[in-house]
């Protein structure tokens, strides 16, 4: 399975209002529930006003479009990283999944995943 290394720094944060998010930014994930509005974005695009903020994330994208009938893809990746004491923040889109790790664990995560048989592109 191919994983695409994302070559930018990411921030995970919470905002008080959806209006705080630049919807014209080139790359971001947002989730809104009855409890919070979360945002994952390029660190340089982080809104000025956040209620909580955690910088220093890097990521991988599972290449290709994942069919909803596929089982265990994210679980397998997260287990490999957990066995090597690397925490993750996972984000899913309609097509695929993204795995974020803290910047200080990024190179270790790449090495571990390649050793486990994944191809990084």
Task: Write out the residue ranges for each language-model feature.
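Regulatory modules associated with amino-acid/nitrogen control
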Residues: 1-82, 108-121
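A generic structural motif
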Residues: 36-41, 96-102
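A cross-kingdom feature marking solvent-exposed beta-strand/loop segments within repeated
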Residues: 84-99, 105
């Amino acid at each position: 399975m191919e994983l695409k290394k994302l070559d930018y720094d990411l921030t995970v944060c919470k905002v008080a209002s959806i209006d705080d998010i630049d919807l014209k930014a080139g790359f971001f994930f947002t989730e809104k529930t009855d409890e919070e509005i979360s945002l994952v974005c390029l660190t340089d695009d982080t809104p000025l006003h956040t209620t909580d903020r955690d910088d220093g994330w890097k990521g991988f994208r599972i290449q290709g479009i994942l069919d909803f009938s596929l089982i265990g893809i994210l679980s397998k990746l997260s287990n490999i990283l957990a066995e090597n004491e690397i925490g993750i923040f996972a984000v899913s889109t309609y097509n695929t999944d993204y795995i974020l790790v803290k910047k200080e664990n990024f190179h270790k995560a790449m090495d571990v995943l390649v050793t486990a048989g994944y191809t990084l592109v």
